[in-house]
């Protein structure tokens, strides 16, 4: 049996391992996660409103540009983003039983292909960081980290409303602030590998099902929970990208590779 058949078989037997989430059935943990996600949107919306009413920064182009994002990094970034969207969409649609059996088969195939492509992207990311100059941005300097993180937190909560300058501007030595660095390291070297691993085990259930018969339930629950956690990161990441001198400035840097001060 090929991997696609394994995936389709596993998906068709999903209800045997974990109930599909329908409007009539939402487990308590999913309700809590949903409330937290909505709460996050409200907090980000309030923060955006306070920023808009605060001191305005000049949007004038100061001509200070630093080339921080190579073509390889930008290609990886946009490929990663597209695959994440496709995987989340196909996975959530299946879990919430939004379509019929015929569409499920197509969504499983999309999910499988995108999963392998995401694995390739992640391996490329690890390779770029291992042999290129991008890796040092992910090495956390532990000495004084708490003080730096506190300073960055204060900026996000108060300083940004007052038009203060960023305490840790992006440079060729460090393109991430302390909070960004920890978040990106956690996602790229923790959350994403776990998502890929649980996804592969879901694709090849016979690898664990015969040895640990009850593990399939927890495998699916874990994979779905990790995917839901990634939603928090994605929304937070997108919002923070709007906190530059202009709302579109950071997005532009991922197009041409230049960070603007």
From Swiss-Prot:
Induction: Up-regulated by the oxygen-responsive transcription factor FNR under anaerobic conditions. Repressed in the presence of nitrate or nitrite via the two-component systems NarXL and NarPQ, respectively.
Residues annotated for a menaquinone binding in this entry: 237
Necessary cofactors: heme
Residues annotated to bind heme b 2: 111, 223
SUPFAM superfamilies, per database record: Transmembrane di-heme cytochromes
Keywords: Cell inner membrane, Cell membrane, Iron, Membrane, Metal-binding, Transmembrane, Transmembrane helix
A GO MF term: heme binding
Protein name: Putative cytochrome YdhU
